[in-house]
């Protein structure tokens, strides 16, 4: 395999070199210089230049090299009467008849006409559907920063349609209006994005009669209908249009009485690249005789190239005729919204508010090239002009759009001559006027569409145009998850080169990236496997299958009806790792699409009117202006504006300006609120980032960091982000994330991708609760809030009577009906909105107070428009109960820190019902102080986040009035609980909430694996508790101190003692000295547990101390090694250094690191001693030795804090050894021979005795004993098993950080600890010591996966701490699981059996001798960010 990748790397480099040489010969230097510049620094307001359009002429390239154009469409026609339209506008339902999807596939461009004539029936073609004067036209909306090929498709409509229902037009969850869904089309070089979309109007009638009917004489009573486009089934293929043809329906009459374009047919236009790199575009025309049209029709003029007209503050739509029209346009431009054009209504229909919000660009997809000689020369910009613009554009890439426009105006006559030439050439080929299905295409072909000018003759008003946000459309054949779909992506017969696969993909991604701010949204209804479309045809299984394939992350194979395409599809294999991903020559890697905020950080913001935020195209910038005129009229309810996922958008933009919780700044990157704004179960806002291997930017093309732009040098190295493939410096690419395509292994990612991935993970966890089953404890979840009639219509059972929903009185609980609380209170919530007693919180009450109901509550956009996606209606905005605004749709309480800046965190108040609490938001300092001063038996409980509580009480501790802060929830992240006793200040009237913030910081650190233990520390980075001199906390365990009247958590726990900044070096280097010094200061043994603010520091400058020789006070590179459990006992003429036998390895490490002439080590606090040495620094900076002891107890054993053996004593000195007390430790001077003997004894784990005194003395002065004693069992004090309450004291345990963690239904189950209850160390039970780790990991993973479906129910039942005891013995293999001292209920055991039994039996096979009994501890948490 390595040889294969090496060969592939060599071949790829060779191909790249040859390609660059060919480029040098055939492409101008300008293109070569800017090739990677488009990747490294793409212009944010212009399109990437397309070198494939360098020469556009009439010659045709070989058919084999021409890419195929695949148009996917699913047309739905809905004939509506005027009454039905009004009914729909008022929030009711109207019908929608989905048509069977058709698609054309043509493998040979030459034989296209013959294939169309021979192989396709009337129903298989793209039909031109004409409607009456009341029809609304279509407007294709193009993103202003994408190379786009627009293909507007009109479909025929026959009576063989499946019956379905159009849901409420104003229902924001409705996905039935699939107007203008974009299907991506690819050409070979993939430098132009091609997508087709249209909103088609047709009537449900026989198409044969429709062919014969004069399109201008249709009855006016016909209701308007909308054909909604969505991807077709892979098994029903139609409408393949050859890319070498540009068909244009050029017969447009002029009828002053008709203001709407009566017919529009778009066939295909594509710019294709031949084998020689020169594109050939051939334009054909489907001619419709003038006899079919009555009168003359005004031809609207599409003008391309107005500079900056795509910006919100720019020209937008230019009007050249009526002053009234000009004022209308100016109004729309001031409001920052594109103008909705509406035809004249001769019968006086009151549809005058037809305004929609859409993207920045307006391109009418109903454009008919007038073939008559009577049309004005300067008012028509035909497709030939478009091609001419393409020619000039490709000849000079530096030419701006404004220059292009001017150049086209100058060459207008030449353009029309060329157009006539094209029309004459293409006219004989396709003159079937009876086919009824012609298509007209507009080739964007790399042009930077910066403006759209629409004008018409004096006799006509503007045509009706419906705008659709282009940002909601997917380009390049990607679904809403960014995955390439084989049914949409084009696979050329001539496979692309590797250079195409590697480099041009990156160019496409960068040129598109500006327009992707809104495409990463929800996939829609989860019932259709997360597809982005709500299938309107309930009986068409093939369509469902295709929708599933289209939105799936793994490209699926097309159906049997397209065997040729199936044969040409390459197999997708995603490589990863290496400097440049190796890939087959026919594979195009999928580019991870970042979020908009990812792009905001990635590229500098634009200046001027070219605003960076793509969501600003929805008109949020100036939504407040002219909002009354911009709101869509109710009469347009049947022509709703929907995005890719079928969500209705029109009322959102209309009302967002009036909703304070949604009023975001126009340049805010947080404007990407599309999915959550409608209460729909949104998916994570990005997809392929980290899921597929990115295309790496070559080192040679990245001289600077792509974030901070620091230049790379010999010392400043390049680092590739494993998620996006870009090149960054070490500081910008220093984080790590688990990437899916690397089997969830941690890899280096840039800070931008890290933020995106973390947000997306939180998004995914947050939204996972929306697909839960109803809670059996609450019947309200089984009752729908959708009116019965709408349910019937939505299910298609219109002919059957509406269902009757009967609920017994009193079954549904409504907290709002309870007695009013005397003050503002809230229910305790979980992230999914379930109360501890299983009741679902009432939405109205919760939203009023800031909590969320079950699932994801949506924001109600209008009091009269119910949001049916929420289990209960929401009537007010959702704001975080701490006062800050959270992201719309996110569960309240999911933030890491719920402490407001200007107040206190929420308080839990017991309601008297077991398991039920009320939540008081922003309690006042006065009321809190009053309750605390009253001194009730129970403490106040503050909510710091959904998993962390803090209990507060004022206590009297050792005759001191103190605040007592206690945490609850630290155990779940592997951290001991924290207790802080803070002495109250005189007349203190405010609760010191800095303690809360520090608790949250400790929780964050513990999540990252950084926990504090006994004699550990945490420091402050800023002023704390009103003083910058407060340096941090020193954490100690309680020994001899009094714990009376304190609020204590479940063991284990630590006490935090406030220390000063001058004391922080000792907390880092030698914390036991600081602890004992505090005890000496306050005359408490061994130290006080309370903290005193603004006290004098106990240590100053380090000065002259022996510790300067043993530890590094300057850089903290080394400290005095401390062996856990080692103590020093000092008695009369006897000093004992006791080393626990189970700390042999630690002792060896300390000895091996020490100098050969010096052996030193720190000691632990000796609980068996009744006194201890203390080092005190006086005012002169000198260190003195004192001793503290237990009050009223005689001193027998005195402890010391360290020992030092020095081998510098010479035998000529006359001493065997010398011992002395230095500061708070013992120093022993021995000879070099004795030092060697001591080290050898320690290695052999033997006791060693040193005799001190003169060599000729009759009696020795003192003995120094180095002893190996029993194992250190001073662990797990007070810990009991959650399975059966068994004490876990003295049992060895291991904390687990970054271990197994699984998320489901808004909950997280974490494996935090493992105890080894029985393990015979002398007998190696497992074949390898690492087997312990592997076995426990496998068991933990199986346990978590088995309980994931039950996490919600377990937490509701109070079983948040779970234990799993596994026994592996020769005669017994099994497990026990329990919580709260009881075994788990039987309902969970079946899943555990199937998951654990295979793993445990597999581990039992590794046994050799002796039993293994281990207990794993798990916690169930809320998923917080």
Swiss-Prot record:
Gene coding for it: ZFYVE9
Ranges of Polar residues composition bias in the record: 230-245, 296-312
Binding site for Zn(2+) 1: 705, 708, 729, 732
Subcellular compartments: Cytoplasm; Early endosome membrane
GO biological process, one term: transforming growth factor beta receptor signaling pathway
SUPFAM superfamilies: FYVE/PHD zinc finger (SSF57903)
Modified residues annotated as Phosphoserine in this record: 306, 668
Mutagenesis / variant outcome for changing residue 788 to E: Diminishes complex formation with SMAD2
Effect listed in the UniProt record for changing residue 793 to A: No effect on complex formation with SMAD2
InterPro entries on file: SARA-like_C, SARA-like_SBD, SARA/endofin, SARA_Smad-bd_sf, Znf_FYVE, Znf_FYVE-rel, Znf_FYVE_PHD, Znf_RING/FYVE/PHD
Subunit description: Interacts (via the SBD region) with SMAD2; the interaction recruits SMAD2 to the TGF-beta receptor and is disrupted by phosphorylation of SMAD2 upon TGF-beta receptor activation. Interacts with SMAD3. Interacts with TGFBR1 and TGFBR2; the interaction recruits SMAD2 to the TGF-beta receptor. Interacts with PML.
Free-text domain note: The SMAD binding domain (SBD) interacts with the MH2 domains of SMAD2 or SMAD3. The FYVE-type zinc finger is necessary and sufficient for its localization into early endosomes and mediates the association with PI3P.
SMART domains, alphabetized: DUF3480, FYVE, SARA
Effect of residue 783 to A: Diminishes complex formation with SMAD2
Outcome when changing residue 788 to A: Diminishes complex formation with SMAD2
Name of the protein this chain belongs to: Zinc finger FYVE domain-containing protein 9
């Amino acid at each position: 395999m390595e040889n294969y990748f090496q060969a592939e790397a060599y071949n790829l480099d060779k191909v790249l070199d040859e390609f660059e040489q060919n480029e040098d010969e055939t492409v101008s230097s300008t293109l070569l210089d800017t090739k990677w510049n488009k990747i490294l620094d793409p212009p944010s307001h212009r399109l990437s230049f397309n070198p494939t359009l360098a020469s556009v002429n009439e010659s045709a390239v070989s058919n084999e090299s021409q890419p195929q154009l695949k148009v996917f469409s699913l047309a739905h026609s809905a004939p509506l009467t005027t009454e039905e339209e009004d009914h729909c506008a008022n929030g009711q339902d109207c019908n929608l008849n989905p048509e069977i999807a058709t698609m054309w596939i043509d493998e040979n461009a030459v034989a296209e006409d013959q294939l169309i004539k021979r192989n396709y029936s009337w129903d298989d073609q793209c039909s031109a559907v004409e409607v009456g004067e009341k029809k609304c036209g279509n407007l294709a909306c193009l993103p202003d920063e994408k190379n786009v090929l627009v293909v507007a498709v009109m479909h025929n409509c026959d009576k063989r349609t499946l019956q379905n229902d159009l849901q409420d037009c104003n229902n924001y969850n409705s996905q039935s209006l699939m107007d203008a869904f974009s299907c991506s089309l690819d050409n070979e070089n993939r430098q132009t994005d091609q997508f087709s979309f249209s909103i088609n109007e047709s009537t449900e009638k026989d198409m044969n009669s429709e062919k014969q009917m004069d399109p201008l004489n249709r009855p006016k009573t016909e209701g308007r209908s909308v054909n909604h486009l969505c991807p077709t089934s892979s098994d029903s293929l139609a409408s393949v249009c050859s890319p070498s043809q540009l068909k244009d329906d050029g017969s447009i009459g002029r009828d002053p009485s008709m203001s709407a374009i009566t017919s529009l047919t778009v066939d295909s236009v594509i710019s294709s690249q031949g084998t020689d790199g020169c594109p050939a575009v051939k334009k054909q025309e489907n001619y419709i005789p003038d006899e079919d049209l009555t009168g003359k029709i005004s031809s609207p003029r599409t003008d391309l190239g107005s500079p900056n007209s795509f910006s919100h503050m720019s020209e937008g739509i230019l009007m050249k005729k009526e002053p009234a029209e000009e004022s209308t346009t100016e109004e729309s431009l001031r409001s920052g919204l594109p103008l909705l054009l509406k035809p004249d209504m001769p019968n006086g229909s009151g549809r005058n508010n037809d305004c929609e919000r859409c993207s920045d660009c307006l391109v009418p997809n109903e454009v008919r090239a007038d073939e008559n000689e009577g049309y004005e020369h300067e008012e028509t910009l035909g497709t030939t002009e478009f091609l001419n613009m393409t020619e000039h554009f490709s000849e000079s890439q530096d030419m701006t759009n404004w220059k292009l426009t001017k150049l086209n105006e100058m060459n207008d006559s030449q353009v029309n001559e060329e157009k006539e030439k094209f029309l004459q050439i293409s006219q004989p080929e396709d003159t079937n006027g009876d086919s009824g299905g012609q298509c007209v295409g507009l080739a964007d072909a790399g042009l930077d569409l910066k403006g759209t000018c629409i004008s018409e003759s004096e006799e006509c008003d503007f045509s009706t145009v419906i705008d659709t946000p282009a940002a909601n459309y997917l380009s390049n054949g990607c679904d809403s998850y960014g995955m390439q779909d084989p049914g949409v992506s084009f696979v050329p017969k001539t496979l692309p080169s590797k250079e195409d696969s590697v480099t041009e993909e990156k160019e496409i991604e960068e040129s598109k990236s500006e327009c992707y701010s809104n495409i990463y949204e929800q996939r829609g209804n989860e019932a259709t496997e997360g597809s982005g479309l709500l299938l309107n045809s309930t009986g068409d299984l093939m369509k469902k299958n295709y929708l599933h394939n289209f939105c799936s992350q793994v490209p699926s194979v097309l159906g049997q009806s397209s065997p040729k395409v199936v044969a040409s599809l390459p197999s997708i294999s995603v490589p990863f790792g290496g400097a440049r991903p190796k890939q087959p020559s026919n594979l195009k890697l999928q580019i991870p699409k970042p979020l908009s905020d990812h792009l905001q950080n990635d590229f500098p913001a634009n200046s001027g009117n070219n605003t960076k935020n793509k969501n600003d195209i929805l008109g949020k910038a100036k939504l407040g202006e002219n909002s009354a005129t911009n709101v869509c009229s109710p009469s347009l309810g049947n022509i709703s504006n929907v995005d890719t996922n079928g969500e209705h958008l029109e009322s959102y933009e209309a009302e967002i300006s009036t909703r304070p919780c949604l009023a975001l700044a126009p340049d805010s990157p947080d404007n990407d609120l599309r999915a959550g704004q409608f209460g729909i179960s949104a998916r994570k806002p990005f997809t392929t980032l980290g899921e597929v291997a990115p295309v790496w930017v070559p080192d040679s093309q990245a001289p600077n960091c792509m974030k901070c732009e620091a230049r790379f040098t010999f010392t400043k190295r390049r680092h590739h982000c494993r998620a996006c493939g870009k090149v960054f410096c070490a500081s910008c690419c220093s984080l790590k994330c688990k990437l899916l395509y690397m089997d969830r292994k941690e890899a280096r990612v840039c800070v931008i991708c890290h933020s995106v991935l973390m947000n997306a993970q939180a998004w995914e966890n947050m939204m996972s609760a929306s697909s839960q089953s109803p809670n059996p404890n609450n019947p309200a979840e089984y009752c729908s809030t959708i009116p019965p009639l709408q349910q019937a219509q939505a299910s298609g059972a219109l002919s059957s009577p509406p269902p009757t929903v009967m609920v017994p009185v009193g079954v549904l609980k409504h907290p709002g009906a309870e007695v009013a609380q005397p003050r503002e209170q809230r229910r305790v919530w979980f992230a999914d909105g379930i109360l501890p007693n299983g009741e679902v919180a009432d939405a109205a009450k919760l939203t009023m107070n800031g909590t969320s109901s079950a699932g994801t509550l949506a924001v109600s956009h209008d009091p009269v428009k119910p949001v049916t996606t929420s289990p209960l209606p929401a009537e007010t905005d959702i704001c975080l109960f701490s006062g800050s605004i959270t992201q719309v749709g996110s569960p309240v309480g999911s933030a890491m820190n719920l402490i407001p800046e200007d107040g206190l965190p929420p308080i839990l108040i017991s309601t008297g019902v077991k398991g039920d609490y009320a939540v008081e938001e922003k309690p006042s300092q006065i009321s809190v102080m009053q309750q605390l001063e009253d001194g009730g038996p129970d403490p106040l409980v503050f909510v710091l986040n959904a998993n962390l509580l803090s209990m507060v009480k004022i206590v009297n501790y050792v005759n001191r009035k103190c605040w007592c802060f206690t945490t609850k929830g630290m155990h779940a992240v592997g951290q001991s609980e924290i207790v802080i006793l803070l002495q109250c200040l005189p007349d203190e009237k405010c609760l010191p909430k800095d303690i809360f913030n520090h608790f949250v910081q400790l929780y964050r650190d513990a999540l990252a694996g950084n926990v504090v233990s006994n004699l550990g520390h945490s420091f402050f980075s800023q002023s704390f508790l009103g003083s910058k001199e407060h340096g941090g906390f020193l954490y100690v365990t309680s020994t001899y101190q009094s714990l009376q009247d304190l609020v204590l958590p479940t063991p284990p726990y630590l006490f935090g003692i406030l220390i000063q900044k001058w004391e922080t070096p000792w907390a880092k280097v030698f914390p036991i000295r600081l602890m004992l010094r505090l005890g000496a200061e306050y005359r408490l043994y061994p130290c006080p547990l309370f903290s005193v603010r603004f006290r004098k520091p106990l240590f100053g400058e380090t000065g002259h101390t022996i510790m300067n020789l043993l530890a590094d006070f300057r850089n903290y590179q080394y400290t005095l090694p401390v062996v856990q459990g080692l103590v020093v006992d000092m008695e009369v003429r006897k000093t004992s250094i006791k080393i626990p036998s189970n700390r042999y390895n630690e002792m060896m490490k300390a000895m091996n690191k020490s100098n050969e002439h010096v052996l030193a080590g720190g000691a632990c606090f000796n609980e068996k001693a009744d006194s201890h040495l203390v080092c005190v620094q006086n005012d002169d900076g000198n260190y003195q030795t004192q001793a503290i002891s237990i009050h009223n107890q005689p001193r027998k054993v005195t402890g010391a804090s360290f020992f030092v053996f020095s081998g510098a004593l010479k035998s000529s000195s006359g001493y065997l050894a010398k011992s002395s007390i230095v500061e708070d430790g013992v120093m022993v001077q021995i000879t070099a021979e004795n030092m060697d003997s001591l080290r050898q004894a320690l290695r052999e784990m033997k006791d060693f005795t040193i005799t001190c005194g003169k060599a000729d003395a009759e009696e020795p002065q003192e003995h120094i004993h180095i002893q190996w004693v029993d194992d250190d069992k001073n662990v797990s004090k007070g810990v009991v098993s959650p399975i059966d309450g068994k004490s876990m004291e003295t049992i060895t345990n291991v904390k687990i950080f970054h271990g197994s963690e699984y998320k489901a239904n808004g909950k997280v189950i974490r494996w935090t600890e493992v105890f080894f209850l029985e393990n015979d160390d002398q007998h190696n039970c497992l074949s390898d010591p690492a087997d312990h780790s592997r076995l426990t990991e496998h068991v933990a993973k199986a346990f978590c996966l088995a309980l994931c479906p039950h996490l919600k129910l377990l937490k509701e039942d109070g079983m948040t701490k779970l234990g799993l005891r596994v026994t592996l013995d020769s005669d017994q293999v099994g497990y026990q699981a329990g919580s709260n001292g009881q075994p788990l209920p039987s309902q969970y055991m079946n899943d555990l059996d199937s998951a654990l039994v295979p793993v445990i039996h597999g581990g039992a096979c590794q046994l050799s001798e002796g039993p293994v009994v281990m207990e794993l501890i798990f916690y169930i948490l809320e998923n917080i960010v």
